[in-house]
């Protein structure tokens, strides 16, 4: 089976995301990520040229997953009711169920972790977060 580096890239991202949620973006140094992911420095920099590139990849992955969760929940709510108010209540209920199933330690919100340190985050990363918040608002207001 050919190696394309996807597993290693995902491992680095998983470690970095957990670290950012635990100690913030500033506390998640490249060196700490390298150590915890058990990869070489050259491997890290093969996948991410800078810490900013890693941060951007993390938020893009998080936003993609968030978008899928959101759309799945909204689709289910729309299938269960035609009434917009009921759809909204079902949608909120689905998210409550999802959060009730989370096990400690709770993963946290990458958007919030980044926004706490917005001065250390680039405009493009903040734009991704803003885009997702606007998507949520627009989609809920359609209901």
Short names for language-model regions:
Residues 1-7:
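N-terminal intrinsically disordered/low-complexity leader segments
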Residues 5, 13, 59, 63, ...:
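Amphipathic, non-transmembrane alpha-helical scaffold segments
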Residues 11, 15, 19-61:
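Helix-turn-helix
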Residues 24, 34, 102-103, 127, ...:
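N-terminal helix-turn-helix DNA-binding core of bacterial DNA-binding proteins
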Residues 36, 61, 65-76, 94, ...:
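Solvent-exposed, charged/polar functional surfaces in cytosolic regulatory/catalytic domains
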Residues 57, 72-106:
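Hydrophobic alpha-helical connector segments
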Residues 67-68, 86-93, 106, 119-143:
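Amphipathic alpha-helical packing segments from all-alpha helical-bundle domains
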